[in-house]
């Protein structure tokens, strides 16, 4: 009889425990913030200093996690002042790439409402054969500003390395 009471108590406790759980569809919940970030490789180190290579072009891709609710205006630019941060983070001794060796034809982009990305930002490198082969150069390109959304700080900048 005691065993019967214990089984009945256990069954009642189990029923209360199981029925007390909330039935929510966790797939409908967002467990992240919708922030803008650079989705291309953070460090592009395939740019070589060679007499035969005078020009190169690279692109920065960016995106947000969920479709935009409204248009997002984004501005990019080179940030040579971030060279020291690059050297500290990646334990390097690179020099900032001089402005005469690159151009960014279009420094703004727009992610339209309902989209998660837009056209890539193009960086044109020129006269790279004039760089000193004994040095490493870095060009940090960063998101300066974005309207209607926050920028993910850890993925705000892309670094282009010449070696």
Positions of predicted regions on the chain:
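First exposed extracellular module after export/assembly in secreted or surface-exposed proteins
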Residues: 38-163
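A generic signature of intrinsically disordered, low-complexity regions enriched in glycine/proline
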Residues: 10, 28-29, 50, 149
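Bacterial N-terminal signal peptides that target proteins for export
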Residues: 1-8
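Bacterial Sec-dependent N-terminal signal peptides
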Residues: 3, 13-44, 157-163
